[in-house]
Amino acid sequence: MAHQKREATSDNGGGDEEWASKRPKVVGAAAEKEHILTSDASHETNGDEAQGGDASRKENTVSTNPCVSDEKAATNSNVSSGHGVILTSVEADAAEDKGCRHTMEDAWVLLPDASMESPGNLRCAHFAIYDGHGGRLAAEYAQKHLHQNVIAAGLPRELMDVKAAKKAIIEGFRRTDECLLQESTKGNWQDGATAVCVWVLGQTVVVANAGDAKAVLARSTSADGEGAVDDAKSQLKAIVLTREHKAIFPQERARIQKAGGSVGPNGRLQGRIEVSRALGDRQFKKVGLIATPDVHSFEVTRKDHFIILGCDGLWGVFGPGDAVEFVQNQLKETSSATLAVRRLVKEAVRERRCKDNCTAVLIVFKH
């Protein structure tokens, strides 16, 4: 069966939407029977330029249909609190802009039905950002293969098992990195990519990251969590779900030194690379850089409204609470994940002068 190719639809209403009016084609790139929405290096550029900058930029966003399921699974949680509630659907979208860089090295995945060739009773959705450095090849490789490897490693498909899910994700990262290093050796390229990934399995969210890309959860502060995200009275707090991995941090520095590497006065591994965990980067793998992710999970409750995934470019100009407040305001105004994530990236690049590639994925929970 050939890869499916679909034209993305638009909710354009003028104004902000003109900034990203050229919508990309959507290509199923990871497996023959996989319905996947991914970033695409061949997207068109709209010709807009940054104020005060010479580099042209692009922003692309692909709408997804909500993944609807009446899952009744309940699981253990190491993050969540509050009353359990059935999560009926997940709506997600992504936006990107290359900023003042000449190339876009980020890649992202929107996979509202992530069961692939392993269907089961458990809802499975997957979303990710791979922030490339030194090129785009490592990010694209992870985009195409990491989720496949996680599925193959035994991601639960019938009954939720948090321990098994975490084990499968860690093994999927290991296998992806192993194969990526083989490919990069054959191709004589040295790209790397940090990663932040989310799997929605039934009522449970599992988050994995390696490097400095982040995931931030917006959770209601009300006692009962009944307030909708677009309720003017609803107050949300930002919960960072990931831990950055940088060579300058004491725990990572100690691990690097134990592996025979060093951290320079500039806080970089071997004086060259800031992150201490990433996929690829074969020249640093023998001196302490690893691809092992941190993995955390929580059970979704009515208090949990949305998750923002972002590369380091986004978080360089947005604090977690600031980003949650911005997205909440956009959802109050438009009730559209597509417009909210698009405006988030636009704000980061156009108004806050993000110089790096900027990519965000917005995942909205429907209760």
From Swiss-Prot:
GO molecular function: metal ion binding; protein serine/threonine phosphatase activity
Residues given in the record as Mn(2+) 2 binding sites: 131, 312, 356
Keywords noted in UniProt: Hydrolase, Magnesium, Manganese, Metal-binding, Protein phosphatase
Region ranges (Disordered): 1-79
Gene Ontology biological process terms, A to Z: signal transduction
SMART domains, sorted: PP2Cc
Residue positions binding Mn(2+) 1: 131-132
EC number: 3.1.3.16
Cofactor annotation: Mg(2+); Mn(2+)
Keyword Metal-binding: yes
Top-rank taxon: Eukaryota
CDD domains linked: PP2Cc
Cofactor binding remark: Binds 2 magnesium or manganese ions per subunit.
Biased composition (Basic and acidic residues): 31-46
Cited SUPFAM superfamilies: PP2C-like (SSF81606)
Keyword check for Cell membrane: no
InterPro entries (UniProt xref): PP2C, PPM-type-like_dom_sf, PPM-type_phosphatase-like_dom
Record field: catalytic activity: O-phospho-L-seryl-[protein] + H2O = L-seryl-[protein] + phosphate; O-phospho-L-threonyl-[protein] + H2O = L-threonyl-[protein] + phosphate
Domain PPM-type phosphatase: 91-365
Family per similarity comment: Belongs to the PP2C family.
Protein name (database record): Probable protein phosphatase 2C 67
